[in-house]
Regions:
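A structural signal for short loop-to-beta-strand junctions that line the ligand-binding cleft
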Residues: 81-82, 89-90, 119-157, 186-190, ...
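Conserved C-terminal helix/tail region of periplasmic/extracytoplasmic solute-binding proteins
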Residues: 160, 368-439
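Short, solvent-exposed loop/beta-turn-alpha elements that line the ligand-binding surface or hinge
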Residues: 111-125, 209-231, 279-280, 293-301, ...
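Extracytoplasmic/periplasmic substrate-recognition and gating elements
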Residues: 60-61, 66, 138, 162, ...
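Hinge/lid segment of periplasmic solute-binding proteins
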Residues: 95-150, 174, 200-203, 287-289
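Glycine-centered hinge/linker elements that transmit conformational signals in sensory
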Residues: 179-180, 218-248
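Extracytoplasmic/periplasmic solute-binding protein
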Residues: 135-145, 150, 174-221, 264
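Extracytoplasmic "Venus flytrap"/periplasmic binding protein-like
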Residues: 57, 61-125, 157, 161-162, ...
């Protein structure tokens, strides 16, 4: 028996599963029609129509493979239940976040280094997945498919009316906010009543001011958050001077509605908010720009992470040829565009794709592969970092910054004690690989 490492509720349930179960599951051939059945379970139910169209298109053009794509409302719960029954899909479509890290740590995914389509994926998104490994691993275990982008959405009509230009440094951003205030307009609107929205500006600032692998450095014992996150925490709190009074009284929907109605010129949030905003004001002219947290414009990067990526479950080697054929189909340019048109996402594949207009200001970063992942993709959910940030923002005491940063380090150790021990043991055995300074 092999005991899986526990990190999420899924893995707690899986804890005592034997490695051999990966060799069981659905048969390769459907006895009814002799086709090889490839089943995908993906976690984005909002994209169900796009995947239904892709499934139908694939099955209409392939005689020897039948593709089945399931898009349940709570994919992680569905997967957990199926894993208990030892009923594994062939491919899972999940985000590049802590769940992916835990699946990797539990040896649940197949090494797909030999998949030729990897050469067409932007390097930043491949790097993102490597940084999600708790300890360095040989091989590649996911193919990034779609990403999202976060920064600052702005009302393009208001900007053009006043002749405001897009800031490229933090000082320029502060000056812009002051100009907007002088015009009698609110620069920013926040929905901090919903604590998760505190992570939007946090992530957008952190990609510029903190190393992308800072969490790995902390686990390795070569860095502390109290140093790495100090400038991030200082900048996020400075934004309150340009927002509505008591932003903790308003939630995400309130902020989307206020921005849609022109109550603020800007909204620090991801591109995922645009459909909600457009539901209030379908004709709103929205564009976006990268949060300019650096003094040097060349050092600014786009906050963009793997929103959807494909991993093959371990033990599916007998289906590998059919699985790779499905992946090839999904990565055909016209099929990627089908998803983009439906979901307003960012493609992880290199190529000339038509992006939604609200990403125009971010195109240079997307096309130049100048991107870094969301810091919160490395945070354990039980640590509730979003609530910690909200508490810090509400704290007006003189020592609020130090209190917050010290708590971040303390809570990180509390919720990652076993992981830290594992990582530090690894680097004791592999001292030449020790992480320092964003390596």
């Amino acid at each position: 028996m092999k005991t899986f490492k526990k990190a999420t509720s899924i893995l707690l349930i899986l804890g005592m599963m034997a490695t051999a179960v990966f060799m069981t599951g659905c048969s390769t051939k459907d006895p009814a029609n002799g086709k090889t059945v490839v089943e995908i379970v993906q976690y984005k139910p909002e994209a169900v129509k796009a995947f239904e169209a892709l499934e139908a298109k694939f099955n209409a053009t392939h005689d020897d493979i039948e593709l089945v794509i399931d898009s349940p409302n709570d994919a992680m719960t569905v997967l957990k239940t199926r894993f208990i029954r030892e009923d594994y899909p062939d491919i899972i479509g999940i985000g590049g976040d802590i769940n992916y890290s835990n699946f990797l740590d539990a040896d649940m995914l197949m090494d797909i280094s030999d998949y030729e389509g990897l050469k067409d994926i932007k390097e930043s998104y491949l790097k993102t997945d490597k940084e999600l490994e708790f300890v360095p691993m040989e091989g590649i275990y996911a193919v990034p498919y779609m990403a999202n982008a976060a920064g600052i959405l702005y009302n393009k009509d208001i900007f053009e009316e006043h002749g405001w230009t897009i800031p490229e440094t933090l000082d320029e951003f502060y000056k812009l906010c002051e100009e907007i205030q002088a015009a009698g307009i609110l620069p920013l609107y926040f929905g901090f009543k919903d604590t998760w929205t505190c992570l939007a500006p946090w992530n957008a600032i952190a990609v510029d001011l903190a190393d992308s692998d800072i969490c790995a450095q902390v686990n390795a014992g070569t860095a502390q958050f109290k140093d790495a996150y100090r400038p991030v925490a200082e900048v996020i709190k400075s934004l309150l001077a340009y927002a509505q009074p008591d932003p903790y009284a308003y939630g995400y929907n309130d902020a989307c509605t206020a921005f849609a109605r022109g109550e603020s010129a800007m909204f620090v949030i991801g591109s995922y908010a645009v459909p909600q905003i457009k539901s209030v004001n379908p004709d709103m002219n929205i564009d976006s720009f990268v949060f300019p947290a650096c003094d040097d414009p060349e050092q600014n990067v786009l906050n963009s992470g793997n929103d959807l990526q494909w991993s093959v479950m371990a033990g599916k080697e007998d289906k590998k040829e059919a699985i790779y054929e499905v992946l090839n189909f999904l990565y055909e340019d016209e099929n990627i565009q089908t998803y983009l048109d439906d979901q307003s996402a960012v493609p992880c594949k290199k190529g000339d794709f038509q992006l939604p207009p609200m990403l125009d200001g971010m195109k240079p970063y997307i096309e130049g592969d100048r991107m870094a992942d969301y810091q919160d993709h490395h945070y354990p959910s039980e640590m509730a970092v979003d609530a910690m940030i909200q508490t810090y923002l509400m704290d007006d005491s003189a020592n609020s910054l130090d209190t917050f940063l010290e708590k971040f380090d303390t809570e990180w150790i509390r919720y990652n004690r076993d992981l830290i021990a594992k990582v530090q043991k690894y680097y004791e055995e592999h001292p030449n690989e020790l992480l320092e300074g964003g390596e």
